[in-house]
Amino acid sequence: MMTRVECFNPHRWIILHVAIIIQSKANAQSFSPSPPDLQTGHTPSKTTVFAVLVTLFFLTGLLSVYIRHCARSNPDSSTRYFRNRANDGSSRRGGLDNAVVESFPVFAYSSVKESKIGSKDLECAICLNELEDHETVRLLPICNHLFHIDCIDTWLYSHATCPVCRSNLTAKSNKPGDEDDGVPLAAMRDHVVVDIETVEVAKSHHRRLSSEISGKFPRSNSTGHSMDRFSDGTERFTLRLPDDVKMRLMAVKGRRLKRTRSFDVDLTAEHYCRSGEESSNTIGSGAKSGRVNWPDRWGLTLFVSKSNSGSVRSQKSNGEPLK
């Protein structure tokens, strides 16, 4: 039996090798990594947009820092803005009307400093600064709290309550002596009586009450604060005046009072020495009263009467010295 021997065919081997090479190249192309731009997903357009956004963010930060720096260098600018908006008579955002705000009395703090009840210095509850003599202040008659005019006007632009006690400032006060619209301004100027004896009694009573409270409530070990200081928390913002002085303030409400000798009554020895010549005609041996002629800017003549009641009276005169 003869064995069949197949002949070697080189054409088949060539075709097989070519097919293997082509298959290997196809597999290599399918598994080759993509270009960097396609792999990361970044394109030149996206890079430009990102750079623009970063630049805008940086410029916005610089602008905010610049605006804050300008606001700190000129702190009164915001106050002027709110005051101008308030004076326009436009609609307020939850605040009081312009007419209501102007009805609250405005005056110099020096005009009531000597007449106030209590020896402690007053502070503004909004800025927490001590009130100076030359500063203009505004009084809230309902609660007797005193503020700088710029501070309280800015507050009342968006609020209708007192910043200290939260009293509703839109409600009219019915307390006697707070406001008397029936009394004309001319009548109030003609006759003003300040009872010094009442003021002194009130001051002594206030000092005695403070000493009693501080004696009954010693320093607390748990809080480190005394009860006297706690009870006096709002007193440093409260202006307490005699009824007559407060009536005079309400009579000229909404107007800035100038410092006048007829209102700033100061019974000191210096005033008596300066006016000794005018009072020499009225003070004699055994006399119980002495009058000092002090003409003021309102055309009033102020004289001091040292009587048993201890009162100081101001009456209108025609400018002639009293005899």
Swiss-Prot record:
The gene is ATL32. PROSITE patterns: ZF_RING_2. Residues 210-229 are annotated as: Disordered. Its main location: membrane. Keywords: Membrane, Metal-binding, Signal, Transferase, Transmembrane, Transmembrane helix, Ubl conjugation pathway, Zinc, Zinc-finger. It catalyses: S-ubiquitinyl-[E2 ubiquitin-conjugating enzyme]-L-cysteine + [acceptor protein]-L-lysine = [E2 ubiquitin-conjugating enzyme]-L-cysteine + N(6)-ubiquitinyl-[acceptor protein]-L-lysine. Its EC number is 2.3.2.27. It is found in: Membrane. The keyword Ribonucleoprotein does not apply. This is RING-H2 finger protein ATL32. Belongs to the RING-type zinc finger family. ATL subfamily. It is an enzyme of class 2 (transferase). GO terms for cellular component: membrane. The chain crosses the membrane at residues 47-67.
